[in-house]
Amino acid sequence: DGATGLGDQLMPGKSDAAWLAAFGARRLMAYMRDGALPQEAVSAALFDAQTSFEALRKRPPADTWETPFSSMMFVAEDAQGVEALWFGDCAALVKRADAPVEIVGDALERRQNEARRVAKLAEKHGLSPAAGVNRPEYLEALRKARNFVNTNGHWAFGPDVRAADHVSSKRIEAAKGTVLLLCSDGFLALASDYNAYDGDALVAAAQAKGLKALCEELRAIEKNDLEGKKFPRFKTSDDATALLLRVR
């Protein structure tokens, strides 16, 4: 899930965020198909991202905030269950038989912190919370925060191979029939921000309604709160991506 750009685009394509998300996903899957272990795939994909970024960018970033970064939730099944590796605020919701949903990742805490930050900035500058990340009043704070990425524990997927040593990981017990809902923070907002579901209800709805219906529900909530006054956020809508899996 590529982080929204905060300045000039440096890479070819639709956006730097879109380039990194697509590039990273392709490289991770390619290395897994070649037999790499999950940690090896992450390390190699980061190396490739750094190499490609340095070769194709229009110019070097003037500061860290110009560098493309993304969140990631990467899961791989093996004989012991499922291994999850992640950066940032993507999440994996794990539903086992007769057990509550387990949320893997740091997304809930990060979303809550962001909502508080948005509300505080909006009040300070007299803006609607969802005025947009390109507002000068927001850009300064967002760029300052982005400059801390890949320092002091704030690591993300990006063109920096050093991040491989800081990827979060968890071994997930996943017996046959276990359901996993992988999602970006924009999709998880149904539970983390908009209180339309809790974790269990969101996984159940994904199975009963399908992901497309949930995305439509998500956009309807956002459409009814365009200024972000009920649900503070930097943008009216964020990218929402989800994948529903079942262990066989």
Q: Model regions: which residues?
A:
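PP2C/PPM-type serine/threonine phosphatase catalytic domain
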Residues: 2-248
